């Protein structure tokens, strides 16, 4: 068995999916680095995508949704601010879980350090990973 980072392994096992070798470039977000992508076993129209997103102070993470489930965790937390709200802490180690077609994010990173997110998406194949929400 190949060496797999513990976080990826736990997430993959929890979702019942294995990952492929290919890691194509992304065009949906400059902050997201795709790590692995594979078809979801037993579901021919779905795929599993593992990614790392790194957001720097001043970056905005636009409001968006996915055509499937997003699960993961905050590898490195930091201060964020949603429009019209007081700053809040996105805590290191916090879980990430967003249901199909549920709008989320829409915040600005206010620092002082970078925020790093590990995510696994189980989504409809052939659809964009992100649909931006106004």
PLM feature spans:
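Short acidic-glycine-tyrosine-enriched beta hairpin
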Residues: 40-42, 55-56, 84-102
């Amino acid at each position: 068995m190949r060496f797999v980072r513990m976080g990826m392994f736990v997430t993959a096992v929890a979702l019942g999916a294995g990952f492929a070798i290919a890691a194509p470039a992304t065009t949906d977000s400059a902050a997201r680095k795709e790590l692995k992508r594979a078809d979801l076993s037993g579901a021919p129209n779905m795929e599993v995508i593992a990614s790392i997103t790194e957001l720097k102070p001043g970056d905005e993470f636009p409001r968006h949704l996915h055509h499937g489930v997003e699960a993961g965790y905050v590898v490195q937390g930091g201060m964020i601010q949603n429009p019209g709200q007081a700053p809040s802490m996105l805590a290191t180690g916090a879980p990430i879980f967003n249901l199909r077609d549920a709008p989320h994010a829409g915040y600005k990173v206010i620092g002082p350090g970078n925020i790093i997110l590990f995510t696994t998406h189980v989504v409809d194949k052939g659809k964009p990973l992100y649909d931006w929400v106004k």
